[in-house]
Amino acid sequence: MYFAIRLSFVLAVLFCLTGNGNARMLGADFNRLQQLQRRSHQSNDANTQLKIAYEVIGIYDKYKGQKGSDLLREAQLNSEVNDFKRKNVVVDGVPAQGGGIKDAVKKIADEVPDDVKKNAKDIAVKIAKSVTKSIFKYFLN
């Protein structure tokens, strides 16, 4: 009997310690989400927004599908995240450069008017902010 009581106490302590470890990880990710949210509001640079979006998506991927999550809301967010990933390819933290056709793309890009380039960057920023805002709402509200 004495052994069973000691064993249950040890198991209870181990259970509490593992629970606190997960809570700390969630707390660290929660703090990181808040930092990224502030950076997202402060910056209008397309590359910065894409980096923020991919980091936020990484945190979302880590916690999605956990017990007690809103399945309908999560399905809509998954659709939005997958659409964003499909349209915005990032390699090693920077937007994809085009590989072997880089020179041809560069020549074409040089001929594109500056206002079109600016509009394209604005659209990229808006899409990245939209995805990050949806994930912020999912976690922070």
Swiss-Prot record:
Cellular compartments per GO CC: extracellular space
Compartment annotation: Secreted
Keywords, sorted A to Z: Immunity, Innate immunity, Secreted, Signal
UniProt key word Secreted: yes
Signal peptide coordinates: 1-23
Example GO biological process: innate immune response
Function description: A humoral factor that may play a role in stress tolerance.
Family statement: Belongs to the Turandot family.
Protein name as annotated: Protein Turandot Z
Lineage of the species this protein comes from: Eukaryota, Metazoa, Ecdysozoa, Arthropoda, Hexapoda
